[in-house]
Amino acid sequence: MIRLAGRLAALIGALMLPAAAAAVAPAAHQIRVRIEPDTRFLEGRDSIRFDAPRAATLVLSARFRVDSLVVDTRRIEVPDKPADGFQRITLPAARRIDLGWSGTLAPLDQNLDHRHTLSYAEPASGKQGTFLPSGSGWYPAVDESLERYSLELDLPADQRGLVPGRLVEERLAHGRYRARFEFRQPAEGIALMAGPYRIEERRVRTAAGSEVRLRTYFHPEIAGLASGYLDSIAGYLDLYERWIGAYPFSEFSVVSSPTPTGFGMPTLTYLGIDVLRLPFIRATSLGHEVLHNWWGNGVYPDYARGNWSEGLTTFMADYAYRERESPEAAAAARLAWLRDYAAMPPGDDAPLVRFTSRTHGASQIVGYNKSAMLFFMLRDRIGEAAFDRGLRAFWNAQRFRIASWDDLRRAFEHASGQDLAGFFEQWLDRTGVPELRIADAHAVATGAGWRLSVTLAQGAPAYVLSVPLAVRTAGGEITRRVELSRERGTAVIALPAEPLEVALDPELRLLRRLAAAEAPPILRDAMLAEHPRLITPTADAAVEAAARDLAASLLERAPAERKPASMQLVVGLHADIDAWLAREAMASRPATLAATRGSAQVWTARAGDGHILVLVSVRDAQSLAALSAPLPHYGRESYLVFEGARMIERGTWPVKSWGQVLH
């Protein structure tokens, strides 16, 4: 699986493979490719072989010219190519196809921000780096087919490059760097990376007894980070081999990109230079990418029936690290998932079974967070031991196969002895999440203690739920699970001491819509807003221009003036913001964000009519311009303080920690 923080939406049609493709023997490519980054020239030859004669359609970018095409022993004339997009070359049944092609790659755009990188699908090259995404048509891919390959790469002597797979040999001679790679497992495509890299290598013996080659391909300015990254990779391999099973490949590399990318693919991850510099990446995102070599690159999602791999990887990586940190950190992670979901406009929601890739914030909330919460609830239901048995059984049965949510369900059913059809159906096939509330709660004294009656209510059609209820009594806190399968149900709980308060799911163990008191406004509310509005209460033209740039960077939808605003982004100098708040009779600047602290303060608030406000108060236009790049990365925060582009303080507004008081 080739992932760009998921997959490129523009390439889904080209890369999505039906399950039937698994039944057809993969095409075998023998590719030789030469790249000249100075001129962005690419020249390649590919010999494609099939186990038996078959018709095939080749997909190649229209930016390339087909120099030669031979099908078995017959030379074929190629139809005129389109001006842009892809050439689709349909060929008769054959065992072998030989094709030569050449052309000019797109220029490397180092000005792309993270969001635009998600939708950039061109094969690009330059002195600082070359990246040819698997679905960009840089080589003649066989449509609707898995592929095996051998690839020989030819680059100038000051460049190094790689593709996913096993490094067979590399050499430096006659002013050229040459390397040969093999990928013998069925793959969904081939991506190629190159750059002025310095390579560091380490060989490790894994828990399963295999020798794995670990490498970093880093630009010179971050070469000093290599040793720490190699240490971390080795640790993650050990963790996941013990949890799931043997690492399925012979190597793993971390490769730096001059643009803010976030790709994961078999045997490697491709991350932006600035991302790799971040101190927390080794403890978070790196493990996520290593784990994808089991889920996504070792077992392939059946995209036609939903991508389960991002949620499972998020649960076993990002969330698992928080769980190992502390119960409080794990609960904070679950709160962040549910708070993100609460920020998503209802029209952006979709059933989890339809998720294929991350293309925007809403798809990440569904495909990563909602999916990870499903696995958390599943583990709660069947127990950790059965959950882990199910994971290992799924891995052993589906290794290098295309697998669906149904295959996962069957593995967990066998491991737990439970029928999980209803559980998976309601969380996969339905749009939305339960909206739960305590409709009534009262207690009466009995001879043996107290009897608490709690009536729970949810919307229609009802979910089948096991709802945690926490009761604070005069003698301490007691937790019970209450089964709810209708729109309304009453549970009676016997207690040894007088109940004082009752709370619905205070530990956030259910996927549900948070109540308003549980979901303080966060920056994500602005980023995903359906009808955002930009307000600039300033006479400074430079501030107005920087505010428009910030809105373009931060918001997923362009600000509009004609529709009623669901969110207002108010941007100005410190004095302008204070005056606007007073004029609109809004609450003044929070005490925690004094105007003298930092060059910029950002905070969220809720207006009297319920819509969200995001206020950005800055020292000057330069301080505002500095926010465009970093601010979109802090969607889960309620307030932030910046000094230039550096975040110096952040936090979320407090939430109500308990539930209904009993009288």
Where do the protein language model's features map onto the residues?
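A surface-exposed beta-strand-loop module
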Residues: S61-L118, H174-G175, L484-E498
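Zinc-dependent metallopeptidase catalytic helix centered on the HExxH motif
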Residues: T269-A332, L391
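Solvent-exposed alpha-helical segments and adjacent loops
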Residues: P520-H663
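Acidic/His/Gly-enriched intrinsically disordered linker/tail segments
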Residues: R184, F280, E310-M377, R381-I382, ...
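Hydrophobic helix-coil surface modules that form long, contiguous segments used
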Residues: P140-G287, E310, F315-D318
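Glycine/proline-rich low-complexity spacer/linker segments in large multi-domain proteins
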Residues: W101-Y149, R509-E530
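Amphipathic alpha-helical substructures
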Residues: Q364-V454
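Beta-strand-rich binding/interaction modules
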Residues: V66-D72, L420-A421, P434-D505
